[in-house]
């Protein structure tokens, strides 16, 4: 006759303090992202899954919890999804149903997403990658979902460029070049500035599911920096990227503002209470530190601020 093992996790803790998030990270699953009239995209996604833990319970039954989590994720990813945030939402709701001691379930997913495009000058076929970010939080009051992406681009420092332009202006004056010719030259030939590799992160969260097209969101993020970058670049493409970046030099702060403007202009149908998170981090080329800026705001606030320009 087998003896039932004690359920230590269900006992009371020595210190009766509740925990906001208990769960697992690094759970890898295949996710099929459906496309109408086309083959689905298969993503290798990494999940984080959490529930809250009441003060009267010692633990979250990690081994048993993992069975529930695995079953939940398998159910959520078994069918093709057209929106990755819905995968997280379905998983969070199922997780909440299966835990009688929790009031909140959170599921977060990241995956690398590949799109096809052409290089800007030579028009050669290439691919671009972005990191998809999706999450969902389920409570008895409902489920909120978030969708976003993290992309890489190029930025040029306006301050450094301004100093180069000033030096060029003085040199041309010493060569007796007329002022209007100098200004026309500097306008059409942006001067050198130190560059950075930029990382833009943009997410949109709302109750239910945000009406956001993932590809459009990625486009907004890529266009927020001085220039896009490409995996494949022939010499004409390198020239194009360098020129475009120096023609639109941006501080890290300017990139976040461009994200805000892009969201407002691209997604007019999003509700005012949608929460937009915008982050920009630049890997500095001439400093040992990096630059960072961010803004988290409701969409109605961003709409008001952008309309004031």
UniProtKB/Swiss-Prot annotation:
Record-linked Pfam families: GCHY-1
Keywords: Hydrolase, Iron, Metal-binding
Class of enzymatic activity (EC top level): hydrolase
Cited InterPro entries: GTP_cyclohydrolase_FolE2/MptA (IPR003801), GTP_cyclohydrolase_MptA (IPR022840)
Catalytic activity as recorded in UniProt: GTP + H2O = 7,8-dihydroneopterin 2',3'-cyclic phosphate + formate + diphosphate + H(+)
Gene Ontology MF terms: GTP cyclohydrolase I activity; GTP cyclohydrolase IV activity; iron ion binding
Cofactor: Fe(2+)
Subunit structure: Homodimer.
Protein name per the record: GTP cyclohydrolase MptA
Organism lineage string: Archaea, Methanobacteriati, Methanobacteriota, Stenosarchaea group, Halobacteria
